[in-house]
Design a protein with these regions (language model features):
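Short, hydrophobic-biased segments on the C-terminal half of alpha helices
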Residues: 44-45
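All-alpha effector-binding/dimerization core of bacterial HTH-type transcriptional repressors
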Residues: 77-92, 98, 102-110
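N-terminal helix-turn-helix DNA-binding core of bacterial DNA-binding proteins
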Residues: 4-35
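Mid-protein regulatory/catalytic core that forms ligand/cofactor-binding pockets
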Residues: 104-182
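A short, conserved structural fragment
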Residues: 48-56
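Basic, amphipathic "hinge/linker" alpha-helix immediately C-terminal to the N-terminal HTH DNA-binding motif
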Residues: 59-78
Length: 182
């Protein structure tokens, strides 16, 4: 059983390695988690000793197979909880992230699988991010950033890169949601 802090680090490393050009550097991890670089370095050494990451000072951190499996499991739990909160408890998409951050640390695989079944096995969370399946497979879809469209192009909103509450509220105020045609 991993601590909440360990789970948060693994999730951050996974996300950074999949979204940021330079990958999960000490500074990038610290920035994402709101933690000082020296504290991050200490935790990275611990994660390396647990064989969850491959850590080499001044290089981007890579997850081991075990670390990646844990990270994907955490992301699966988080995104399923977001779907539950939006679809079943009527939270708006800008309210669910922080609540899901707390719920994601419940480790019962039986609970997560039942939640998945209860929600009819959703493929994407309320922000358009893919939900890993029970085997840890992430089914991504082709997406194009809005900035790459040219005037006159039509597109359907399938996800948002910025899932901050303020940005999601801005989109709501503009009546832009997932599935909205532009």
């Amino acid at each position: 059983m991993a601590s909440n802090a360990v789970e948060n680090y693994l999730k951050a490393i996974f996300q950074l390695n999949n979204k940021v050009k330079d990958g999960a550097t000490t500074n990038a991890i610290g920035e994402q988690l709101g933690i000082k670089a020296a504290t991050v370095s200490d935790m990275l050494k611990k994660l390396d000793s647990l064989k969850l990451i491959n850590y080499k000072k001044y290089h981007a951190v890579q997850l081991t197979k075990k670390g990646e499996e844990l990270a994907v499991s955490i992301i699966r739990r988080h995104r399923l909880w977001e779907v539950f909160l939006v679809e079943k408890l009527a939270f708006s998409w800008d309210e669910v992230h922080d609540i899901a951050e707390e719920l994601e640390h419940i480790e019962s695989s039986e609970l997560v699988n039942r939640l998945d079944d209860f929600l009819d096995n959703p493929k994407f969370d309320p922000h358009g991010d893919p939900i890993p399946d029970r085997d840890g497979v992430i089914h991504r879809r082709d997406q194009l950033p809005l900035a790459e469209l040219t005037p006159g192009d039509k597109a359907v909103v399938t996800g948002v890169k910025d899932s901050s509450s303020s940005f999601l509220q801005f989109l709501d105020n503009q009546n832009i949601q997932l599935g909205h045609e532009l």
